[in-house]
């Protein structure tokens, strides 16, 4: 399977924008995440893989989820292929290669050596990013292979009904051959991705000055610091905004409320910020001891656009009860899983809880969720 042709398909299958497979399943409350990619085992065997992490509600709707997956694949198969989407993906891949971050020589050799048998030496470095030839026939050929008769569905669940036990690891499982069971979802209106507004256009480097760090603004409500650094030769920057809350995030209840709200804001932004992620700009929103931090990283050109989007959503989010219930479920799962960490990780967490007043035991956090 050619990487550039499969990438067109997997980028669309894994997209999180309006009308995407991810957006539909997420809005139904059936999934926590969805990702798509290609995997090659040898010259004759390749797969297109869709990984879906389901919610408890979604685990009871596997037939509908699989049905939605094939509805979207059928939609792609029936739609005229979009050359502008391919060109957009190609320009992003070229941008990624142009400003790829340095790696250790050993790491580069380790990753390139297995590809020598299938890639000419001149293309070794650029091959993973190369999307120069638009081949609609090849893309259609791959889409036509994505059928219910040519699929392997794996469902990992604690509540799955099993019939056998694996010989070596003693893992219970069930193997079912034949046509898979799906349920048609009638309220799914699939759409193709639209133009990405976050693709950087201005890539010139800011001249480096002799000042290590400079305060550009300072008053009772706002303080701004700036530092220019072109040492790495890439038009990337980091923007960090800290919103201080009176009294800070101190008690277990404060921590739970802050984490749940941050989770809801992130969830509400998924469709809008996904194009930024594709364009090499990422963000994080996190609760800190003094308040909330918004962190933007990546290509500098469209960072302010993303920052405004995140800040406005943080200040104006309307809480949906169903989304809050899903967020609580995810929060409980994450906190409960801390007990499964490696012993040294648990020891470090306990040490922080003993020494830092704003770090709280998992049971105290769980007690404040409801």
PLM ranges: what are they?
Residues 1-5:
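Conserved small/polar residues in nucleotide/adenosyl-binding loops
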Residues 9-12, 257:
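Hydrophobic alpha-helical transmembrane segments of multi-pass membrane proteins
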Residues 13-18:
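Catalytic adenosine-cofactor/nucleotide-binding cores of aminoacyl-tRNA synthetases and other
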Residues 21-139, 152-156, 233-370:
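M16 family metallopeptidases and their MPP-like homologs
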Residues 124-266:
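Segments forming glycine/polar-rich beta-alpha architectures that bind adenosine-containing cofactors
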């Amino acid at each position: 399977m050619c990487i550039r042709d499969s990438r067109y398909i997997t980028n669309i299958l894994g997209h999180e924008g309006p009308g995407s497979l991810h957006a539909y399943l997420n809005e139904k409350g059936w999934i926590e995440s969805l990702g798509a990619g290609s995997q090659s085992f040898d010259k004759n065997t390749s797969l297109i893989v869709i990984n879906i992490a389901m919610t408890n509600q979604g685990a009871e709707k596997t037939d509908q989820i699989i049905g939605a997956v094939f509805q979207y694949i059928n939609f792609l198969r029936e739609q005229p292929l979009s050359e502008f989407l391919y060109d957009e993906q190609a320009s992003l891949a070229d941008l990624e290669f142009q400003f790829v971050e340095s790696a250790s020589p050993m790491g580069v050799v380790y990753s390139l050596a297995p590809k020598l048998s299938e890639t000419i030496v001149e293309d070794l470095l650029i091959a993973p990013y190369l999307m120069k030839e638009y081949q609609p026939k090849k893309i259609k050929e791959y889409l036509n292979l994505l059928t219910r008769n040519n699929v392997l569905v794996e469902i990992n669940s604690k509540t799955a009904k099993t019939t056998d036990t694996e010989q070596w690891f003693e893992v219970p499982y069930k193997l079912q051959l034949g046509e898979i069971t799906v349920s048609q979802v009638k309220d799914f209106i699939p759409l193709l991705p639209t133009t990405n507004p976050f693709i950087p256009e201005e890539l010139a480097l800011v001249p480096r000055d002799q000042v290590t760090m400079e305060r550009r603004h300072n008053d009772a409500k706002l303080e701004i610091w700036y530092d220019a650094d072109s040492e790495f030769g890439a038009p990337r920057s980091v923007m960090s905004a800290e919103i201080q809350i009176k009294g800070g995030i101190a008690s277990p209840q404060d921590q739970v409320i802050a984490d749940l709200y941050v989770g809801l804001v992130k969830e509400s932004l998924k469709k809008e910020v996904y194009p930024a992620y594709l364009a090499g700009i990422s963000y994080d929103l996190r609760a800190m001891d003094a308040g909330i931090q918004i962190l933007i990283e990546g290509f500098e050109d469209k960072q302010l656009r993303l920052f405004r989007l995140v800040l406005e959503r943080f200040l104006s989010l309307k809480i949906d009860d169903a989304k809050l219930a899903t967020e609580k479920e995810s929060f409980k799962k994450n906190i409960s899983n801390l007990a499964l960490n490696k012993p040294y990780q648990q020891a470090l967490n306990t040490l922080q809880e003993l020494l830092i007043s704003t770090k709280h035991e998992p049971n105290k956090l769980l007690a404040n969720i409801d």
